[in-house]
Structure formats: structure tokens, C-alpha cells
Amino acid sequence: MAAVVAVCGGLGRKKLTHLVTAAVSLTHPGTHTVLWRRGCSQQVSSNEDLPISMENPYKEPLKKCILCGKHVDYKNVQLLSQFVSPFTGCIYGRHITGLCGKKQKEITKAIKRAQIMGFMPVTYKDPAYLKDPKVCNIRYRE
């Protein structure tokens, strides 16, 4: 450093600062020098201030069909009965079961086949009882 000052003694302070900054940058590539006092310098790595890539923590995981990759058989009554309402005998829709379209069709066909073959009961109820029963009979004043 003393040699640089002796050689560049005729230069002004501003030019000397730029010369020292360039010399430090050449010796340590990938860093830049911040000069904030007369002879006091600090080297800062350029990678410290860059944003870090990470997954979105608020993103919901993708819902996957639980039967994809599984074989659906009309004789498997225990599996098929999970997709039929015990009160009405109606087959639950995709929005309730969470199945993909292909597996929902397979389940529907398997349930119909099992009902025709006699493996599963066919439940028909009076339309008056198709709605869910009310838990509390609360009468409001009119």
C-alpha cells in the first residue's frame, strides 16, 4: 500500500481512491469494495444481498385421486360402499369423493353392477325422507 501511495503521490484523493478500489477488485474477483473512511475499507460479497429462491409457503398441495393406480372391482363391496350414501343410497359426486373423472365413472359402473348382481343393496327412500333430518326442532316466533 505504501508503494502505491509513493508511486501515485501526485494524484488527487479522488483518483487515488478509484485506483485502490480497482486494485482490490482485481485481486478478489466477485467482490466489491466499499470505502467509507480514509484508509478503512470493507469487502462485501455480491451474493449476500441477492434474494433466495424458495417455494411458496401458502401454496396448497395438489389433491390427488386416492384410487389412481388401483383396480376397482364390483365385488369389493367394502370399497364401493364408501361412495354411497347410507341414508338415501345415492352415489356421492366428485366434489364429495375427490376422485378424478375416470375413477368416478369406474366407481359408478362398479356400484351399479354390484347392485344388479346383488352384492350391494339398492336403497330407494320416500322423497319426503331424502333431506337430512333436522337436529333441533326450533320454532321461531312469528
UniProtKB/Swiss-Prot annotation:
<comment type="similarity">
    <text>Belongs to the bacterial ribosomal protein bS18 family.</text>
</comment>
<dbReference type="InterPro" id="IPR036870">
    <property type="entry name" value="Ribosomal_bS18_sf"/>
</dbReference>
<dbReference type="GO" id="GO:0003735">
    <property type="term" value="F:structural constituent of ribosome"/>
</dbReference>
<protein>
    <recommendedName>
        <fullName>Small ribosomal subunit protein bS18m</fullName>
    </recommendedName>
</protein>
<keyword id="KW-0496">Mitochondrion</keyword>
<dbReference type="InterPro" id="IPR018275">
    <property type="entry name" value="Ribosomal_bS18_CS"/>
</dbReference>
<dbReference type="InterPro" id="IPR001648">
    <property type="entry name" value="Ribosomal_bS18"/>
</dbReference>
<dbReference type="GO" id="GO:0005763">
    <property type="term" value="C:mitochondrial small ribosomal subunit"/>
</dbReference>
<dbReference type="GO" id="GO:0005743">
    <property type="term" value="C:mitochondrial inner membrane"/>
</dbReference>
<keyword id="KW-0809">Transit peptide</keyword>
<dbReference type="GO" id="GO:0032543">
    <property type="term" value="P:mitochondrial translation"/>
</dbReference>
<dbReference type="GO" id="GO:0006412">
    <property type="term" value="P:translation"/>
</dbReference>
<keyword id="KW-0687">Ribonucleoprotein</keyword>
<dbReference type="GO" id="GO:0005739">
    <property type="term" value="C:mitochondrion"/>
</dbReference>
<dbReference type="GO" id="GO:0070181">
    <property type="term" value="F:small ribosomal subunit rRNA binding"/>
</dbReference>
<comment type="subunit">
    <text>Component of the mitochondrial small ribosomal subunit (mt-SSU). Mature mammalian 55S mitochondrial ribosomes consist of a small (28S) and a large (39S) subunit. The 28S small subunit contains a 12S ribosomal RNA (12S mt-rRNA) and 30 different proteins. The 39S large subunit contains a 16S rRNA (16S mt-rRNA), a copy of mitochondrial valine transfer RNA (mt-tRNA(Val)), which plays an integral structural role, and 52 different proteins. bS18m has a zinc binding site.</text>
</comment>
<keyword id="KW-0689">Ribosomal protein</keyword>
<dbReference type="Pfam" id="PF01084">
    <property type="entry name" value="Ribosomal_S18"/>
</dbReference>
